[in-house]
Design a protein with these regions (language model features):
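Short, flexible loop/turn elements at secondary-structure junctions
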Residues: 21-26, 93, 110-113, 174, ...
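Conserved alpha/beta catalytic core and glycan-binding cleft of carbohydrate-active enzymes
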Residues: 180-185, 256, 263, 288, ...
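Hydrophobic faces of well-ordered beta-strands that scaffold small-molecule active sites
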Residues: 16-18, 87-89, 168-170, 269, ...
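Active-site cleft segment of glycoside hydrolase catalytic domains centered on the general acid/base Glu
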Residues: 238-246, 273-292
Length: 583
């Protein structure tokens, strides 16, 4: 589907992206680590985890391992060598949680992942259950010396990425903020900090009063008015009230422009729960239209990528989002076909496992909801911070770490099926996006278990090298980025599809069965000459993978191929075999 005048950034089409959950990637500066007892958060004091390799605990949100921006900088050469073109970071702004989807200050990078230059004040005493005397936290997160130093370090990260020809997308959470936010100040962090206005929780005279929807508004409700609207009822996630505050909208649009402009020069936004913003569809669409104008005016080449479940079409008409995180037309159909598992590992459906009709039907249905330029840069992930890791899904264990134990996430996994999924990912329309550690063999049930640390020093080198080779293949061939796609053949646990443009033609064949399969497929309808040769450029299997060239012959428009169990092959039409039909 094409909308006249709607374009998405060329660099984002088929770009290889890499998602980093910063606290769990690499600790490059231990001096900025959250300290045990630094502040009180959701029922307990926060805790610093000293063992980098310890599995996350059930209430992981207030436990910190120490990953930071310096750690990302330290590993940029690794990411560049892997073939990554775009780094997508989960939220980096000041926030009390490790996931940082509860923003405290949109103007600054959190010094706990940035730089702490002034570090004074006491930690909480054992048993203290509020933040009135969280002086160390107050110093770290409100002192301008720390905030500005953290922004400078972020600028360095962006410069180092751009120096390597790489880009960065950051996470924007504009539907809600956090209860620690300076506009609300429920935790009284800012009440005794210099240079800040009074928060709306504290006083009805706060300049931020209308940034939130309070259900009780009598004068005697303050100080301490906790009747504000929370996203899905969560009082730690106050919903922002765009309907009643033009100042709020203007401020957030200013933030949208600020971070994609000099000196920060971010290359795009990932928008959290973007369809939930506002209290009506009308307000939602109006806001995102203004957001697009603001971002594209500041940086026409910035991408706007939204988290979205369901039909995105009404936001993808050229005047709101560029694209979305691709659940319906990538993660879910591939997970069902290859594993039979739901993306949280909450359910197994035998009727979906290996079902080519369901797979093709789902893909056709959901892909038609995209504009072509949106589909080409849709974020195609196998895993992320909200769902179980794909490698764990290959063991078909239904449940979560709380019931099954964290060790169960790594038992009975099938790396060959993971490789099949990566072949899909690197040859399917969209921007293939790795979740940190997937390439190294990391496992995990749904959150928080999927937020384990990167296994530095104990990587699965077979998987790592396989990812590197598949990324290379993806980047070397434009057909995988912007070419056409056509289904060729489907049987139980067996699929073939074609990717092609005017210059190149590929077949991708997958056997997801536990036994070897020999299949004769009619392939000429996808533009292949009836007599031609195809050359193997990748073969993945249970024992590893191979890029050794192997020739297959198409005779009478048919390809006869044998694939071992749990294997995939990428075949390219030899240039000597005749012209490829036009797109």
């Amino acid at each position: 589907c094409i909308v006249p005048g709607f374009s998405t950034p060329e660099w984002a089409k088929g770009a290889v992206m890499y998602q980093i959950y910063t606290d769990r990637f690499c600790n490059g500066d231990p001096d900025n680590d959250v300290q045990t007892g630094e502040y009180f958060y959701i029922g307990e004091q926060v805790h610093h985890v000293d063992d980098w390799y310890r599995d996350p605990q059930p209430m992981d949100v207030r436990e910190f391992y120490g990953g930071d921006i310096q750690g990302i900088i330290d590993k940029l050469d690794y990411l560049h060598g892997l073939g990554v073109e775009v780094v997508y970071c989960n939220p980096l702004f000041v926030s009390p949680s490790n996931h940082k989807y509860d923003t405290q200050d949109y103007d600054y990078i959190d010094p706990h992942v940035g730089k702490i230059e002034v570090d004074e004040g006491r930690l909480l005493d054992p048993g203290e259950n509020n933040n009135i005397h969280a002086d160390r936290y107050r110093t770290r997160t409100t002192r301008k010396e720390n905030l500005e130093a953290s922004n400078r370090l972020f600028i360095k990260l962006v410069e180092e990425l751009h120096k390597r020809g790489m880009r960065i997308i950051i996470d924007g959470v504009f539907n809600h903020c956090g209860s620690f936010n300076k506009w609300l100040d429920r935790e009284l962090i800012y009440e005794s900090a210099d240079g800040y206005e009074v928060g709306a929780f504290v006083s009805p005279k706060s300049p931020y009063r209308n940034y939130f929807l309070f259900h009780r508004t009598g004068e005697n409700e303050w100080p301490g008015n906790g009747s504000y609207d929370g996203w899905w009822g969560h009082d730690t996630l106050p919903k922002l009230n765009y309907e009643d505050s033009k100042e709020l909208e203007e401020y957030v649009l200013g933030i949208a422009k600020k971070w994609v402009s000099p000196p920060y020069n971010v290359d795009g936004w990932r928008l959290d729960v973007a369809a939930d913003l506002g209290h009506s569809p009308e307000v939602n669409h109006r806001f995102w239209k203004e957001f697009r104008k603001a971002v594209k005016e500041a940086n026409p080449n910035a991408v706007i990528l939204a988290e979205h479940y369901g039909d995105p079409k009404s936001w993808l008409l050229g005047d709101e989002w560029d694209t979305i995180m691709n659940y319906d037309a990538f993660m879910e159909p591939i997970t069902w076909f290859l594993t039979g598992m739901e993306k949280h590992s909450d359910e197994y459906r035998g009727e979906c496992f290996g079902n080519p009709g369901d797979f093709e039907g789902a893909m056709r249905h959901h892909m038609t909801r995209f504009m072509t330029s949106s589909l080409q840069c849709a974020m195609n992930e196998l895993s992320n911070h909200d769902h179980s890791r794909f490698l764990t899904r290959t063991n078909k264990k239904v449940g979560r770490a709380e019931q099954l134990g964290t060790d169960a996430a790594g038992r009975g996994i099938n790396k060959a099926v993971m490789k099949e999924a990566v072949v899909f990912q690197m040859t399917w329309p969209g921007a293939p996006t790795l979740y940190y550690g997937d390439e190294a063999g990391q496992v995990g049930f749904t959150d928080p278990d999927n937020r384990r640390t990167y296994p530095w020093g104990s990587e699965d080198m077979d998987l790592l090298n396989f990812h590197r080779e598949m990324i290379r293949i993806h980047k070397e061939h434009e057909a995988f980025k912007t070419g056409s796609i056509q289904f060729v053949w489907g049987e139980y646990n067996f699929l073939c599809y074609a990717r092609y443009n005017r210059r190149e033609h590929f077949l991708v064949v997958l056997n997801n069965d536990a036994v070897s399969r020999t299949v004769e497929m009619v392939v000429w309808p996808v533009g292949l000459p009836k007599e031609c040769e195809l050359e193997q450029i990748m073969y993945s299997h249970e024992d590893g993978f191979s890029t050794n060239p192997v020739t297959y012959e198409v005779k009478g428009g048919k390809l006869n191929i044998t694939l071992t169990e749990f294997s995939a092959v990428v075949l390219r039409l030899k240039e000597t075999s005749g012209k490829v039909l036009p797109e």
